[in-house]
Amino acid sequence: MEILKIIIEKSSDYYDAYADNCEGVYGAGNTVEEAKQNVLEGLQLFIKYHKNNLPQILQGDYMIEYQYDMPSFLKHYSTIFTKSALQRMTGINQTQLSHYASGFRKPSNKTVKKLDMAIQGLSRELSQVHFA
């Protein structure tokens, strides 16, 4: 099964969403959810109008994987992950996290990996939680 990578990025006015590995699939919105919905609508239109000449990735089964830039992730999940909680999980200073969320500073690849590993670890842990 192919993976269609949709990149979510925060611009100054809205959120962009586009397929990283399939040229021509785009969307945007005022929120991450709107951008996701819009890029899915764009994908359906792309398939409809290119059905006789689809890129290889769209010819068979595929799944969508969303990849966020740091500002998009931090803003979108700010009601779930406080800066304090993220600092405890990652060791990244809250002030730095605020700079990354606002786009004032760009995190290094090492910092992005640190956040990614912490979130993926939490995801794995939570997927094993069940209530009696």
Where in this protein do the model-derived segments appear?
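Short, charged, surface-exposed hinge/linker loops at domain edges
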Residues: 1-3, 40-132
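DNA-contacting interfaces and partner/effector-binding or oligomerization modules
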Residues: 1-54
